[in-house]
């Protein structure tokens, strides 16, 4: 997904049967990016370019430490570029993640909160979930890992948007999360 275009967001909403909201939401997101630019947006865009694209051979969205790829999937050079890009999108508030065997430890242990929530939110299998205040998408990914058919993720932070797209672009197959 082109981070600044959002045409994929619009088509995703249509696929979910949310036609009425597709253009409205995409236009609002475009407006936020245009009218409230973050001074770090260019840096984060460059950081996204350093991250590998579609190279993970496997993903585990149900693990406490979400796993994208495995050790040895990347060349040493690509791994160093990835680590540099991830550092440039600091701080990482939600997680943890394992990206091609490299731990990405966040400020908050979201896996511990998920453990408390998981038994109280009901069965997610086949459900469409709205994740308001999704941060970088950690919980959205865990919901997909728990069987949600799709997640619509909303957060006003442009950093979290970049972090989410950075994680997802490394996956071989994009999860049904619409941020």
Language model regions located:
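N-terminal accessory regions of S-adenosyl-L-methionine
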Residues: 1-110
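Conserved alpha-helix/loop element of class I SAM-dependent methyltransferases that forms part
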Residues: 107-127
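Conserved class I S-adenosyl-L-methionine
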Residues: 127-135
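Conserved SAM-binding loop of SAM-dependent methyltransferases across substrates and taxa
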Residues: 136-147
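Short beta-strand element of Class I
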Residues: 149-154
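Conserved SAM/SAH-binding beta-strand->alpha-helix loop
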Residues: 157
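Conserved SAM-binding loop
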Residues: 164-165
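S-adenosyl-L-methionine
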Residues: 168-179
